[in-house]
Amino acid sequence: MKPLVVFVLGGPGAGKGTQCARIVEKYGYTHLSAGELLRDERKNPDSQYGELIEKYIKEGKIVPVEITISLLKREMDQTMAANAQKNKFLIDGFPRNQDNLQGWNKTMDGKADVSFVLFFDCNNEICIDRCLERGKSSGRSDDNRESLEKRIQTYLESTKPIIDLYEEMGKVKKIDASKSVDEVFGDVMKIFDKEG
């Protein structure tokens, strides 16, 4: 059985992680956060990629696509090997740019099906405020204003065109992410109840 994938996209602080956790609980998806996989890998002393990832993340740059895809693929393979029924995945924070998308199409073509793109649309100021709030407790080194403005810039330049591309294919489900967590999840449920 091939993995069924929903790409979850939106700017930093749009609430992707929070909503993914709820989708997992209610709909039995497995949540893979590209950023989290990279952060874990970077901390793993045995990783062949650790230092390289560290360098990219520190500079606010996007990690080379081969690394990200190999981590995503490894996780999907391991999850499905452990339980063949678990073939539905939410991939959060990927593809972030054209290069990511091409890499995915090249590597995963015929190996995984993308059902749709869940796009959390959120005003930049709201996103920044949420991240600064989160930074107080998350300990994430990139939750500071300077890093955030860079991340939002990168997102607008690189990720937004990907969303537009999927939009043309009729594959984007757009959600107003500036609402409260519960309201946003209400909108998410409408989509997943229909799409499964």
UniProtKB/Swiss-Prot annotation:
Cross-link (Glycyl lysine isopeptide (Lys-Gly) (interchain with G-Cter in SUMO2)): K73
Catalyzed reaction equations: CMP + ATP = CDP + ADP; dCMP + ATP = dCDP + ADP; UMP + ATP = UDP + ADP; a 2'-deoxyribonucleoside 5'-diphosphate + ATP = a 2'-deoxyribonucleoside 5'-triphosphate + ADP
Tree of life domain: Eukaryota
InterPro entries in alphabetical order: Adenylat/UMP-CMP_kin, Adenylat_kinase_CS, P-loop_NTPase, UMP_CMP_kinase
NMP, as annotated region: 33-63
EC number(s) reported in the record: 2.7.4.14, 2.7.4.6
GO BP annotations, alphabetical order: 'de novo' pyrimidine nucleobase biosynthetic process; CDP biosynthetic process; dCDP biosynthetic process; dUDP biosynthetic process; ovulation cycle process; phthalate metabolic process; UDP biosynthetic process
PTM sites of type N6-succinyllysine: K106
Principal EC category: transferase
Residues bound to ATP: G13, A14, G15, K16, G17, T18, R134, K179
Subunit note: Monomer.
HAMAP family assigned to the protein according to its UniProt record, in alphabetical order: Adenylate_kinase_Adk, Adenylate_kinase_UMP_CMP_kin
Similarity annotation: Belongs to the adenylate kinase family. UMP-CMP kinase subfamily.
Domain notes: Consists of three domains, a large central CORE domain and two small peripheral domains, NMPbind and LID, which undergo movements during catalysis. The LID domain closes over the site of phosphoryl transfer upon ATP binding. Assembling and dissambling the active center during each catalytic cycle provides an effective means to prevent ATP hydrolysis.
Entry function: Catalyzes the phosphorylation of pyrimidine nucleoside monophosphates at the expense of ATP. Plays an important role in de novo pyrimidine nucleotide biosynthesis. Has preference for UMP and CMP as phosphate acceptors. Also displays broad nucleoside diphosphate kinase activity.
Protein name from the UniProt record: UMP-CMP kinase
Species of the source: Rattus norvegicus
Name of the gene this protein is made from: Cmpk1
